[in-house]
C-alpha cells in the first residue's frame, strides 16, 4: 500500500468500503443460507419422487462438507462459515417431514432471536445478570499471534482448531446461529411453496415482500442504531443484536425480491 494517498482517494476508498459493507455485510451469507435451505428442498423432493428419504444421504453430504470446510479454513484464520452451516443443517434433517405450517412457525421463532431476548429478560429480573463469556476476543487474539509468528504448521493446525472454534462461538454471540437455522427453514418453505416458480400470484407475493421489507428496513435500522448507543453492553449484545439481525434480514428480502422481479424483465 502507498504510505500516503491523496485526500480525494482516501474519501473515495472509504465511500466504496462503506457502501459495499452496508450492501453485502450480513446479507450475502443470509442469501446463501436461504439458498442452502432451498437446495435441500430440491434434492429432498427429487428423492421423494423416487420413493426415497433424502435425510440420511444429506447427513453424509454434510460430513463431506465439514471436511471441505476444514480444508478451506486451514488457510483462512477467521474460520469458515461452512462449518456453521454443517452444524445448523441438522435442523433440516429434523424437520424434513414436518408440515409447511410447522416449518414456517419454527422459522419465525428462530428469527425472533429467542436466546438474545432470554438474556435481556433475565437481566430485567436480576440487574447483576451477565452474559455467558464465550471468550471470542481472547481466541481471536491467539489466532492473530500464531498468524503473525509465521510458522506454517502452527498456522494450519490453529486455523482448523482454534480458528474454527472462534468462528462458531462468534456466530453464537452475534445471533447468527439461530438466524441461520431460521433462514434454512425459510429457504425450505420457499421451495415447498414453489415461490421461485414464475406465476402471477408468486410475483405478487414477491412484490408485497419487497414493499414490506423496504418499509421495515428503515425503522429497524434506526432502532438498532439507537440501541447500540446504549451505555449497557448487555442491551447492545441482546436487544441490539436482535434488531441488527432483523434489519439485515429485511434488507436481504429486499435484495432477493428485487432479483426475482428483475429476472422477469427482458432487459435484465
Where are these regions (language model features)?
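N-terminal signal-anchor module of multipass membrane proteins
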Residues: 1-36
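Structural signal for the C-terminal ends of transmembrane alpha-helices
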Residues: 40-48, 94-100, 188-198, 259-267
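Solvent-exposed interhelical
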Residues: 53-55, 93-106, 189-211
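Juxtamembrane membrane-water interface segments that cap and precede transmembrane helices
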Residues: 8-20, 152-169, 230-238
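Long hydrophobic alpha-helical segments that form multi-pass transmembrane helix bundles
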Residues: 108-186
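Alpha-helical transmembrane segments of multi-pass integral membrane proteins
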Residues: 235-268
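Internal alpha-helical transmembrane segments
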Residues: 41-46, 50-120
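Membrane-embedded alpha-helical segments of multi-pass membrane proteins
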Residues: 28-35, 78-90, 178-185, 242, ...
Amino acid at each position: 500500500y502507498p504510505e500516503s494517498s491523496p485526500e480525494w482517494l482516501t474519501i473515495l476508498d472509504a465511500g466504496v468500503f462503506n457502501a459495499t459493507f452496508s450492501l453485502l455485510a450480513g446479507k450475502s451469507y443470509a442469501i446463501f443460507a436461504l439458498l442452502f435451505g432451498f437446495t435441500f428442498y430440491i434434492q429432498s423432493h427429487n428423492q421423494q419422487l423416487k420413493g426415497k428419504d433424502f435425510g440420511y444421504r444429506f447427513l453424509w453430504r454434510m460430513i463431506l462438507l465439514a471436511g471441505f470446510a476444514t480444508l478451506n479454513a486451514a488457510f483462512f484464520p477467521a474460520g469458515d462459515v461452512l462449518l456453521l452451516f454443517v452444524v445448523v443443517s441438522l435442523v433440516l434433517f429434523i424437520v424434513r417431514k414436518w408440515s409447511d405450517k410447522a416449518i414456517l412457525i419454527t422459522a419465525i421463532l428462530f428469527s425472533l432471536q429467542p436466546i438474545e431476548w432470554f438474556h435481556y429478560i433475565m437481566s430485567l429480573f436480576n440487574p447483576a445478570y451477565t452474559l455467558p463469556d464465550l471468550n471470542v476476543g481472547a481466541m481471536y487474539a491467539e489466532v492473530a499471534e500464531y498468524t503473525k509468528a509465521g510458522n506454517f504448521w502452527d498456522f494450519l493446525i490453529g486455523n482448523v482448531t482454534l480458528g474454527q472454534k472462534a468462528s462458531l462461538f462468534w456466530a453464537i454471540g452475534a445471533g447468527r446461529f439461530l438466524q441461520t437455522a431460521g433462514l434454512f427453514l425459510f429457504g425450505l418453505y420457499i421451495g415447498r411453496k414453489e415461490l421461485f416458480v414464475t406465476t402471477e400470484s408468486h410475483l405478487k407475493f414477491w412484490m408485497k415482500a419487497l414493499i414490506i421489507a423496504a418499509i421495515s428496513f428503515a425503522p429497524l435500522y434506526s432502532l438498532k442504531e439507537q440501541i447500540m448507543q446504549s451505555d449497557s453492553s448487555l442491551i447492545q449484545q441482546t436487544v441490539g443484536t436482535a434488531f441488527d439481525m432483523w434489519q439485515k434480514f429485511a434488507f436481504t428480502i429486499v435484495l432477493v425480491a428485487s432479483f426475482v422481479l428483475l429476472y422477469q424483465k427482458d432487459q435484465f
